[in-house]
């Protein structure tokens, strides 16, 4: 367990702290710690009664208090008699830090659970100087490797969720500018050498936060979260959390009723390290067997290793993943289970499809497109946006030519290498291709060569470009997602919301979200071996594109567009399913929530530095 310093008696209450002119924590330190409650510059100090009641303070405010505050207008009706206390821990949280689906989930799912009346926190590293997160002045001491480190917490309250950021130089010093490509390593495909220490620190800090942060931003909940909580650990970076919970806390009578759900967003990244590195984790020898792992690869070392994700699968109380079909794939065998299939078969693995940000991705309000539209005006609007897209990327402007878009990371998982080889087989059709993505330098070079190989027919843009991503999503007729494996996928969800028909590989969440012939076209199942491009996959991709283009301009295409736009991919449905799973863990005080809108008025957008 960590040691809390004296400054932890003061914690962030609201973002009004900095607005009141306090420039540093030194002002707070001048307050005398008396046995009485006091408020200063948005901070609240613990008094003696607080310390005796910290566990009970994690519960919702009383009905009497709720009645007093009922005069305040909220965005929707919420009844919060008793809700769960849910804490999400991850290496990313959108929009502050995001490389893909993980950041989107931690950005979107927590507000949806909060909207159902639960108390929700997210905990993520503070990679940058986020201008909307304030220093709580809470400092804890955590042992990382053979050193004791001081760790601070920053906080902001958005859309009913306590957003907590773990502050330490091990996170902040490594990231300069955009966090997108530097969260895990200096360049794509290269990890930081001290990632074990970085994420060990994150897991331990996450277990301290519910007890030491006395957060009062919500008028529905007050005080520390306490011990009756559900931790949701996401991917290998947080895999140590169930181990630390058991060894450092429950062994000492703390968090006795807490539970851990481990959510797999991408099983390809498991946290495999040298076997001798186990000593860096400061865990008892009794957990070593959960980490013990053998594979046939030479990275990071040949032979025996430790595997963080394996340990989380075995030690967590429940295992989830991000789509039902992906859950089936994970237990199907060594290839798609990436050598963890036999351990997953020992557990109950459930899949819940992800939602999407229906505010950012909304064709009727999208700030990046000049013409707004909905399901009733899509037929008239899309050709005009297509012409703007063609002009923007330098293709001949012709609304009658079908445009196929690709948006994603340029790497083997996303199948960009398969697509590049397939393009030559369907470029004879009356079609244009736009590829937007960044990633491996070799693959970036491949897409940049398309314009020379197929002038007036194909173009590649190897840049991070949000406005262009929105324009492609709205202006293209088809979006292609040729992934070798895809746990859930968001590109196809965005596309369908904009009436852009997806052409997808038959894997993971793509199977769950795209119905062949109704809301899109399926290519088939790809070979998951990434070392080479399977010629059969190239042929299947070209055939699927040919089939889609044949439907273009027909009444069947118009019907498919409307079917796509008629789907509901908001977080409301997934939140109900998540709630059901979390309630099944029977943490004390947990009761079902109430359907409603955001507890706090919805911010126009989360503010995060680039």
UniProtKB/Swiss-Prot annotation:
Annotated transit peptide: 1-79
Enzyme Commission numbers on file: 2.4.1.242
Known tissue expression: Expressed in roots, inflorescences, flowers, fruits and at much higher levels in leaves.
GO molecular function annotations of the record: alpha-1,4-glucan glucosyltransferase (UDP-glucose donor) activity
CDD domains for the chain: GT5_Glycogen_synthase_DULL1-like
Keyword Chloroplast appears in the UniProt entry: yes
Family named by the database record: Belongs to the glycosyltransferase 1 family. Bacterial/plant glycogen synthase subfamily.
Name of the protein: Granule-bound starch synthase 1, chloroplastic/amyloplastic
Organism: Arabidopsis thaliana
